[in-house]
């Protein structure tokens, strides 16, 4: 049969109804597209509003072509009058299309009883016919509708309509338009004016040379559609196959799917694919779209999946994508490049002294003490900041001065002013540890300790009496060590020192032991873990740690290298557990300059769903196993994992520790055996907290408690030891147990004590850097990094933009910007608009800190961050809080300017501060002003505030 798509200049539903009822009018129908097939019947069609099985047109009436002579109108490109359609109407073929509307019999005396003739049925059901036509069909009466939907050129409109409306393919209009562009690579015909009449539009389509190419285009589009489906099916298969065999955490898996499709269907990739499958006029129809099969799938494998296959394989990841730089030092003790010559000294002091000796004070007392030390040593030593940072610098410094006070020429440290007790003088030659002690009612005290009584104050004398020195399992060995328990805190800092102590990280000291805060987020429904599960988890983590250590640093012997595990004690059954979504288990993520700072939230909320798995306890109404679980933690499982770096190896910058933690975070998800254990019970991604490796941050020591924030005086969640004994100590584990009880093996900056002798001791080394080649930033994982590369427009480099602002277009290719140039840029272009907005929108007591007579000093910290200080003679001072007027205001608020770029040469500057009070969220970043600074040659004002 022959199909004719037509349109009208008047309401199509009424015109069709007139044809059906054989009511002649002066209207015409305009044939737009014709699909020929040898037949004496011609079906006139309209586009349907809904598509059933991709059939987008349906007939509204049929005519006898022997009477109509359709070819005569098509050849003359003329509209068809209604009289011709009425005369040739085939009622036998048309009436079934509307029979469902004529179910109610119509009785008419004028027609001798019941009406049966089709035209009379239409007449008496005229409203139903019109309603049916308007509900089922699209009836556009203007060419502009066709142009806006199908394209603006005759080739685009004709070919798109012919394929989309007549061929019944599962393709959208946008897809068909893409097929047309690939088919007609050079010429799409003339542009159709939107003001054309329906007659002009019909004549254009009926006389278009593209009518002769419809059959070729349809064959190409069918082949292209088949090729597209095959390509996408292959992409789906590859993405799903990798997802099923890769051990991806849940959230990473979701992001991976999005990233994979973005990579496979990126704009540049689709443009390449279009060139591959473009229409080839010289090829046979069956050879169209057959070049380079599997193009998208191959590119996806090359650009993403092959990389991920290696990146998500532990051995390949460590071998190919992690880069470690180590500096070998001179072994001669008198050399300038030896550890002694470089000042790479860890903590001194005694852990088993006769008494506790050190400085204890709140942040206010600390500021006064440091001011006193500055006064006493002003002519000899550099001044110290009156804050925790100053105390850390004092306790880390190895500088000494000469004195004759004893009658002989001797050297002394500035720490003598902090701890003047003569008996402590020999202990002050090496750096001292700085701790933070949590007191009741959320008070905090800072401590610099030279001597303490660790074992005598913390452990009972007979602690190891029942610990065997023979082969025992890890589980049994752990159960032989019993510690006394306390739950009520003391207001005395000296007493509380042995219950709620936290080590403060000091970036000026080398790091000997890697202290990991490991918070494993448990799945919903996991309300307890069996003992076997907990210890297998620790053994699996030890295996991962040793694999990473051996790959990154070498000289690691897994059978004897110690890894110390501590688990946060489970909450009692009577205590509700809150904050399941809290990001950290029990480590304090603060910079602590105010004794009112808070600790982190409690562990997770109770879970309500059940996820059955071996070794996992769920909450059920009837449980087969009535024995209590070994671990009752809900929400997450908190572990402290401590291991020394290999012998004679230290890290000297916190960025190294953050990078190592990032590598371990990824490696934990890649160990096959560990993943099998973790997958049913947890979400292992990003379990290690990298935030603790910042200057001034503190982490709770093993064997210490947390303070209960609700009760104020009660302690809970003590970090208890789990002994995972290396194979070399399996026959005699007592030495390993003693090492795990030794404080010197548990601190960031203390050299390990009693480290086992190795068959081959390495030379002294410094870890300069550890870098993930694909994800150099510790703030983003692999998926996030690749997603940004795929989706985000590329920003201009900061150095390029800074040079453009300094030197104009001639300096835009500068390789580097010196600190002096950066200071000049901040003073001349960045600071004036910031100060203007600061004075306009902030209270005078805030803005006057930045105006005369105060002299400001801008100290670059890299190219993107500039610290703002006030000059006070030879010293620098910080500011009072920019947000609030605190009860005890102090000039300890740090102010910075961040610089960042966009796709143009505009420069964004943000003024932000960091206040250390609880009210200001304890050292959180508070952004005050952000401005956009346009290039010097821009015609608009230099800054726009947001």
Curated annotation (Swiss-Prot):
A zinc finger (CHC2-type) spans 881-920. The lineage of its organism: Viruses, Duplodnaviria, Heunggongvirae, Peploviricota, Herviviricetes. Associates with the helicase and the primase-associated factor to form the helicase-primase factor. Residues 596-626 are annotated as: Disordered. Its EC number is 2.7.7.-. The record marks 517, 519 as: Essential for primase activity. GO terms for cellular component: host cell nucleus. It comes from Human cytomegalovirus (strain AD169) (HHV-5). This is DNA primase. Keywords: DNA replication, Host nucleus, Host-virus interaction, Metal-binding, Transferase, Zinc, Zinc-finger. Essential component of the helicase/primase complex. Unwinds the DNA at the replication forks and generates single-stranded DNA for both leading and lagging strand synthesis. The primase initiates primer synthesis and thereby produces large amount of short RNA primers on the lagging strand that the polymerase elongates using dNTPs.
């Amino acid at each position: 049969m022959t199909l004719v798509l037509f349109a009208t200049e008047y309401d199509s539903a009424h015109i069709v109804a007139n044809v059906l009822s054989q009511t002649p009018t002066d209207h015409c129908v305009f044939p737009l597209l014709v699909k020929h097939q040898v037949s004496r019947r011609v079906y006139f069609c309209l586009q349907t509003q809904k598509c059933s099985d991709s059939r987008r047109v349906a007939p509204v009436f049929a005519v006898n072509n022997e009477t109509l002579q359709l070819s005569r109108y098509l050849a003359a490109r003329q509209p068809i009058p209604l009289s011709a359609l009425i005369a040739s109407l085939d009622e036998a073929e048309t009436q079934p299309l509307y029979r469902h509307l004529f179910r109610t019999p119509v009785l008419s005396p004028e027609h001798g009883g019941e009406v049966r003739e089709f035209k009379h049925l239409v007449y008496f059901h005229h409203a139903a016919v019109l309603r049916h036509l308007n509900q089922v069909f699209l009836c556009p009466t203007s060419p502009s509708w066709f142009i806006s939907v199908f394209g603006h050129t005759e080739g685009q409109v004709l070919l798109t309509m012919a394929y989309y409306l007549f061929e019944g393919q599962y393709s959208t209009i946008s897809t068909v338009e893409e097929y047309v562009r690939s088919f007609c690579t050079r010429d799409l015909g003339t542009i159709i004016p939107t003001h054309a009449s329906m007659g002009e539009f019909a004549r254009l389509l009926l006389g278009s040379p593209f009518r002769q190419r419809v059959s070729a285009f349809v064959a190409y589009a069918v082949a292209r559609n088949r090729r597209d489906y095959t390509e996408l099916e292959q992409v789906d298969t590859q993405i799903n196959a990798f997802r099923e065999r890769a051990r991806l955490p849940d959230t990473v898996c979701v992001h991976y799917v999005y990233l994979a499709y973005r990579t496979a269907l990126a704009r540049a990739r689709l443009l390449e694919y279009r060139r591959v499958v473009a229409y080839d006029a010289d090829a046979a129809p069956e050879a169209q779209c057959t070049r380079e099969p599997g193009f998208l799938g191959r590119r996806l494998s090359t650009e993403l999946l092959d990389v991920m296959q290696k990146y998500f394989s532990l051995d390949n990841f460590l071998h190919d994508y992690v880069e470690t730089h180590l500096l070998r030092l001179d072994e001669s003790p008198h050399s300038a490049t030896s550890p002694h010559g470089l000042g790479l000294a860890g903590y001194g002091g005694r852990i088993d002294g006769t008494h506790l000796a050190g400085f204890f004070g709140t942040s206010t007392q600390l500021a006064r003490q440091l001011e006193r030390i500055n006064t006493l040593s002003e002519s000899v030593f550099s001044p110290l900041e009156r804050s925790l940072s100053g105390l850390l610098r004092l306790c880390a410094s190895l500088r000494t001065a000469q004195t004759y006070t004893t009658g002989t020429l001797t050297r002394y440290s500035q720490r003598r002013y902090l701890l003047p007790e003569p008996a402590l003088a020999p202990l002050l030659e090496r750096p001292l540890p700085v701790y933070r002690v949590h007191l009741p009612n959320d008070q905090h005290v800072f401590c610099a300790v030279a001597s303490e009584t660790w074992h005598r104050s913390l452990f009972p004398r007979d602690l190891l009496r029942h610990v065997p020195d023979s082969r025992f399992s890890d589980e049994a060995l752990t159960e032989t060590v019993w510690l006394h328990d306390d739950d009520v805190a003391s207001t005395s800092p000296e007493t509380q020192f042995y219950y709620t102590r936290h080590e403060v990280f000091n970036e000026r000291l080398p790091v000997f032991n890697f202290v990991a805060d490991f918070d494993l987020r448990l799945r919903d429904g996991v309300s307890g873990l069996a003992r076997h599960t907990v210890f297998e988890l620790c053994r699996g983590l030890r295996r991962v740690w040793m694999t990473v250590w051996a790959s990154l640093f070498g000289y690691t012997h897994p059978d004897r290298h110690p890894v110390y595990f501590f688990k946060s004690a489970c909450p009692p059954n009577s205590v509700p557990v809150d904050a399941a979504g809290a990001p950290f288990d029990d480590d304090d993520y603060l910079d602590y300059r105010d004794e009112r700072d808070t600790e982190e939230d409690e562990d997770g909320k109770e879970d309500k769903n059940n996820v059955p798995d071996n070794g996992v306890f769920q909450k059920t109404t009837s449980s087969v196993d009535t024995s209590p679980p070994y671990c009752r933690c809900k929400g997450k499982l908190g572990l402290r994992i401590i291991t020394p770096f290999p012998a004679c190896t230290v890290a000297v910058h916190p960025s190294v520790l953050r990078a190592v933690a990032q590598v371990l975070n990824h490696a934990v998800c890649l160990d096959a055996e560990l993943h099998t254990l973790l997958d049913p019970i947890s979400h292992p991604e990003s379990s290690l907290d990298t935030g603790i490796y910042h200057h001034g941050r503190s982490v709770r020591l093993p064997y210490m408690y947390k303070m209960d924030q609700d009760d104020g005086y009660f302690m809970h969640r003590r970090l208890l030891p789990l002994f995972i004994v290396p194979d070399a100590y399996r026959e005699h584990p007592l030495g390993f147990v003693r090492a795990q009880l030794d404080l010197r093996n548990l601190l960031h900056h203390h050299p390990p004590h009693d480290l086992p002798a190795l068959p081959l001791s390495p030379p002294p080394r410094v870890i300069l850097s550890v870098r993930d080649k694909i994800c150099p930033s510790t703030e983003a994982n692999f998926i996030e990094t690749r997603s940004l590369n795929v989706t985000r427009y590329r920003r201009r480099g900061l150095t390029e933009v800074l040079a453009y602002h300094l030197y104009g277009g001639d300096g835009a290719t500068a390789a580097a910007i010196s600190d002096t140039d950066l200071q000049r840029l901040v003073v001349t272009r960045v600071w004036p608009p910031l100060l203007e907005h600061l004075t306009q929108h902030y209270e005078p007591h805030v803005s006057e800190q930045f105006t005369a007579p105060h002299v400001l000093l801008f100290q670059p910290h890299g190219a993107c961050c500039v610290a703002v200080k006030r000059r006070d003679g030879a010293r620098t001072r910080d500011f009072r809080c920019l947000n609030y007027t605190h009860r005890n205001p102090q000039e300890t608020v740090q102010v910075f300017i961040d610089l960042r770029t966009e796709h143009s040469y505009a420069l964004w500057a943000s003024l932000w501060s960091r206040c250390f009070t609880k009210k200001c969220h304890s050292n959180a970043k508070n952004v005050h002003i952000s401005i956009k600074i346009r290039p010097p040659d821009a015609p608009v004002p230099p800054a726009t505030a947001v």
